[in-house]
A protein has these predicted regions:
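Serine-esterase "nucleophile elbow" of acetyl-processing enzymes
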Residues: 1-48, 52, 204
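Alpha-helical cap/lid subdomain in secreted, periplasmic
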Residues: 54-216
């Protein structure tokens, strides 16, 4: 058996003291006594996660038995410069005079973010179905207002791509698996202040991912 993990800094293991040993991808792989590879990168968007994952799957000589896909904060985006260089934007890194600030202030709204996330979920699901690739997935977010009420941001009926994903039942990391940082501070690297999942949080994530894989 082989596993492929993809996502943002959560799957990468940010804020862990012993990242390679404590992150959930390692724990899950040890459970199945199998090899794995982790494609995750810090600060990337759902566009980047899906594109990077598909590119890697296309270039592998042997497909993994299961892909574990972690979708991320929906306001993150990527764009290409005139020189075909990929740039990633995150709301947290927007400077006072950055051009990306103009995008988030004048153009971006929650519907755009939701639509982009669901578009990527639809795209990856379609790719896996077309290529007989098994996968499990979950959605993670850093923003407390979304963590507490994800249905307000993710389960609305506005937009087109969400409706195309009517058969997709999302698993929310913080809401369904870890609890909020106020409810379960031990699951977070910064306790009640939140942050990335702690070592205990990654163990909890591993338990949930194992349940999803076993249910395939």
């Amino acid at each position: 058996m082989s596993l492929c993990f993809s996502g943002c800094s959560i799957t990468w293991g940010d804020e862990l003291k012993n990242r390679y040993q404590e992150r959930y991808s390692t724990i899950v792989s040890k459970h199945y006594d199998c090899r794995h590879f982790n494609l995750s990168q810090c600060g990337i968007s759902n566009d980047s996660i899906v594109r990077t994952t598909i590119n890697n799957l296309e270039n592998l000589s042997a497909k993994p038995d299961v892909v574990v896909m972690q979708f991320t904060v929906h306001p993150r985006i990527e764009y290409f410069t005139d020189d075909d260089i990929i740039q990633n934007w995150t709301p947290q890194s927007v400077g006072k005079f950055d051009k990306c600030r103009n995008y988030y202030v004048s153009i971006y709204n929650e519907i755009i973010g939701n639509e982009n996330m669901w578009k990527n979920i639809f795209l990856f699901d379609a790719y896996c179905k077309a290529n007989n690739q098994k996968y499990v997935s979950f959605i993670a977010d850093h923003f407390e207002r979304i963590v507490v009420k994800p249905e307000k941001y993710y389960n609305n009926d506005e937009g087109y791509w969400k409706k195309m994903c009517r058969d997709y039942n999302p698993n929310f990391l913080q809401y369904h698996w870890l609890g909020t940082s106020q409810q379960c501070p031990e699951n977070y690297a910064q306790g009640e202040k939140g942050g990335h999942p702690s070592a205990k949080g990654h163990k909890k994530m591993a338990e949930k991912v194992i349940e999803l894989i076993d249910a395939i």
